[in-house]
From Swiss-Prot:
Phylogenetic lineage: Eukaryota, Metazoa, Spiralia, Lophotrochozoa, Mollusca
Cysteines joined through disulfide linkages: none
Tissue expression notes: Expressed by the venom duct.
Annotated family: Belongs to the conotoxin T superfamily.
InterPro entries associated with the record: T-conotoxin
Keyword Secreted in annotation: yes
Keywords: Cleavage on pair of basic residues, Disulfide bond, Secreted, Signal, Toxin
GO molecular function: toxin activity
Domain notes: The cysteine framework is V (CC-CC).
N-terminal signal peptide: 1-22
Protein name in UniProt: Conotoxin Vn-05
PTM per Swiss-Prot/TrEMBL: Contains 2 disulfide bonds that can be either 'C1-C3, C2-C4' or 'C1-C4, C2-C3', since these disulfide connectivities have been observed for conotoxins with cysteine framework V (for examples, see AC P0DQQ7 and AC P81755).
Coiled-coil regions listed: none
Length: 61
């Protein structure tokens, strides 16, 4: 029973705390999807070079 008031206080404090979404977005915020797209593009480029280079070294530039 002694923990109940502490639990209630923590519950009220956590409910009144600002969420992460409350902070304003700025131009430095980049979505995770764009990072994923960049990673996919880089991986695809590396795979293309890997399959191309043994057959034609000129395409490895």
């Amino acid at each position: 029973m002694r923990c109940l008031p502490v639990f209630i206080i923590l519950l009220v404090l956590s409910a009144s705390a600002p969420s992460v979404d409350a902070r304003p977005k700025n131009e430095d915020d980049v979505s995770l999807a764009s990072f994923h797209d960049n990673a996919q593009r880089t991986l695809q480029r590396l795979l293309n070079k890997r399959s191309c280079c043994p057959n034609n070294p000129a395409c490895c530039h």
